[in-house]
Amino acid sequence: MKRTLISVSVAAALALSFPTLAASERGMDSDTGFLDEAMQFGGHVGTSLEYEDKVTDGFDGNKKKEKTTTHEVFGVYYNNARWNLSALYGLKLENREQRNPGYHENEDGIKHLFSLNKGFDLGNGWATGAIYELEYTRSKVFSPYVSGLRKELAEHSFRPYLTYFNNEHNWGFYSNLEYLYSSEDKSAWGERTEEGYSLLFKPYKRFGNWELGVELYYQIKDNEDRSSSGSINEISDFNEKYIEPIVQYSFDDAGVLYARVRVGENETNNAANSGGGNANVDYFKDIRKATLGYEQAVGDNWLLKGEYEYANEVEEKSKLAGWEAKNESELKQHTVYLQALYRF
């Protein structure tokens, strides 16, 4: 699941945490019907476009080039302050093009995004709640070896969270524990499942128009990949950790400029029965990522957002396979994200 969606959910959880929504904990008013309360909401509708360009200089000495375009055709966000409840749905079209020496691959897919967030105000700046998210993708792959190979991917995330904000000193934090599970059916290419947990902690402090924060993240995950005949391609465990300082400045004309820099690492440890030359092979990856973005309110209802991200990942492994030329794989990635929202 992309971190972009998780960031949106974090922002939604923080929005639900402020004391102005404390009245929502009263529950249903006996003088107001369910439908009347359901119609007391705000939110937004919108669209977005994301373009991602990746080049991987692999262990085999060849370069793999990938270009992915994701168009959010329609997205809607519902926020009911009385119930302290929000929901998000998005419909996206995704196209991925891959080019290797002597090989090419295209994948076209449709992605559905569902998110449900229920918050509870605890008083004195404290709030808690839980977020459930599902990303469901159906796609087809075209290459010299397959024509329209069908893939289905379901990624589930459940995140109970705890937040705090001190109005007097203008500081707070967001934290969550996550359970994640994904299942991918790749037809003739087999099946893959991933299951794990993560922990996120994000303290922040406001100084006038400035906001400074840092995101700390740790994840563990078990992976299993099998061919269509049931033979094992991969049995591995994975862990990742990063630190991401964040600087944000809010302009008086309702514009927000922000920058994030991520420094992290992850490790994949393959079991003795992993296939593809990966038996007992460990992978070590260093992650560097920088993001610069700007949001601007236009009039009373519109919000426009633009974001650029650069990522550099260098990976090494504990043992080379016979066909591999070097013990280093490097990825360089450029991503541009544009979004327009109409708020109501």
Show which residues each predicted segment covers.
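Outer-membrane beta-barrel "beta-signal"
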Residues: Y217, Q296-V298, Y308-Y310, E328-F344
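Repeated loop/turn-to-beta-strand initiation elements of outer-membrane beta-barrel proteins
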Residues: A81-A87, D121-A130, E168-S175, F207-V214, ...
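Detector for outer-membrane/organellar transmembrane beta-barrel domains
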Residues: T163-G277
